[in-house]
UniProtKB/Swiss-Prot annotation:
Keywords of the record: Chloroplast, Membrane, Plastid, Plastid outer membrane, Protein transport, Transmembrane, Transmembrane helix, Transport
PANTHER family for the chain: CHLOROPLASTIC IMPORT INNER MEMBRANE TRANSLOCASE SUBUNIT TIM22-2-RELATED, MITOCHONDRIAL IMPORT INNER MEMBRANE TRANSLOCASE SUBUNIT TIM22
Protein name per UniProt: Chloroplastic import inner membrane translocase subunit TIM22-2
Pfam families hit by this protein: Tim17
Lineage: Eukaryota, Viridiplantae, Streptophyta, Embryophyta, Tracheophyta
Quaternary state and interactors: Homodimer. Probable component of a protein-conducting channel made of HP30-1, HP30-2 and HP20 that mediates the import of transit sequence-less proteins into the chloroplastic inner membrane. Interacts with CEQORH.
Segments of this protein annotated with the region Disordered: 1-34
GO cellular component: chloroplast; chloroplast envelope; chloroplast outer membrane; mitochondrion
Tissue and organ distribution: Expressed in young cotyledons, roots, leaves and flowers.
Family named by the database record: Belongs to the Tim17/Tim22/Tim23 family.
């Protein structure tokens, strides 16, 4: 009898172990399937998608601007399409190249500062002036890079200033909310001053005799 009980216990333990192994294998298979279902996009692909979206948006805005500029110059509805195409190309390069370089530098350097924007501006100037003389390329790179760097620095400074002002305002509201008793309650006015002030008000209220 004892041998039979021990053999039954061993069989039950073996079944439990096999069930747990099957459950573990099933969980691992489910995790693998879910990991395969979730497609992770690497950083360069994200930058490329951002480049495509910004370039398309810039092309749309440039075409609208160029077509309106052609109408303003009285080139007619058909003659304005040339200006629309040229402006669309320029705006697409401006938006797309700038966004792509900023995204790549952010992934490489791990920072989001004015240096990234300045380098992106330089690359944008090179793309707009290409092909051209080396002097024109250098001038365009320096112009766009310096302009982008200065604008980004001013934008960062303005954002920091606005944040500090909001913090001061919140601190002032907190102090006003937790302020002690008002001055009129903390320092009561003496009765003599109250009587003199009331008599003065009554004298002003009396009608004058002419």
């Amino acid at each position: 009898m004892a041998a039979n009980d021990s053999s039954n216990a061993i069989d039950i333990d073996g079944n439990l172990d096999s069930d747990s192994n099957l459950n573990t294998d099933g969980d691992e298979a489910t995790d693998n399937d879910s990991s395969k279902a979730l497609v992770t996009i690497p950083a360069p692909a994200v930058c490329l998608f951002r480049f495509a979206g910004d370039a398309a948006g810039g092309a749309v805005m440039g075409s609208i601007f160029g077509y309106g500029s052609g109408l303003f110059k009285k080139k007619g509805f058909k003659g304005s399409f040339a200006d629309a195409g040229q402006s669309a190309k320029t705006f697409a390069v401006l938006s797309g190249v700038h966004s792509l370089v900023v995204c790549l530098l952010k992934q490489i350097r791990g920072k989001d500062d004015a240096i990234n924007v300045g380098v992106a501006g330089c690359c944008t100037g090179l793309a707009l002036s290409f092909p051209g003389a080396p002097q024109a390329l250098l001038q365009s790179c320096l112009t766009f890079g310096a302009f982008s760097f200065i604008l980004e620095g001013l934008n960062k400074r303005q954002t920091a200033l606005a944040h500090s002002v909001s913090l001061r305002h919140q601190t002032g509201l907190f102090q006003d909310h937790h302020r002690a008793l008002p001055l009129s309650l903390a320092l009561p006015i003496p009765e003599e001053i109250k009587g003199a002030f009331s008599s003065f008000c009554k004298s002003l209220a009396k009608p004058r005799k002419f």
